[in-house]
Amino acid sequence: MNLKSRIYEGAITHARTKPVKHNFSFPIYTFVIDLDELDLLDKEVRFFGYNRGSVFTLYDSDHLGSGDGSIKQKLKKWLIKFGHKEKYSTVKMITTLRVFKHTFNPVIFYYCLNSENNIVYHVAEVHNTF
């Protein structure tokens, strides 16, 4: 199986000096997902669920509004709505996934690439962290 999607291990770190000194750091997995591979990932990757519960889960309804359609379809509608019509073939999503149904995902990045693998659009979907 030759997948383009990847998992990266890293850390979330935060430090504040005022009004009260406070800091923390904890491990996190960041997923770079080729949206065309979602069904294959769901079928072949242990502990990954697409639109169903698992250890790591991705739901279409969590992204780009709760409307109908896949994430890729909703992104295409959003780009067209704002007048962006340049063609792209691949969408890579950089995100953290739900872990045991819980989510901490303040920002999701979408990279839309053309057939030459050049970035045509870079979209950030920002969620409130509170």
Predicted feature descriptions by range:
Residues 1-130:
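Mature, function-bearing regions of proteins
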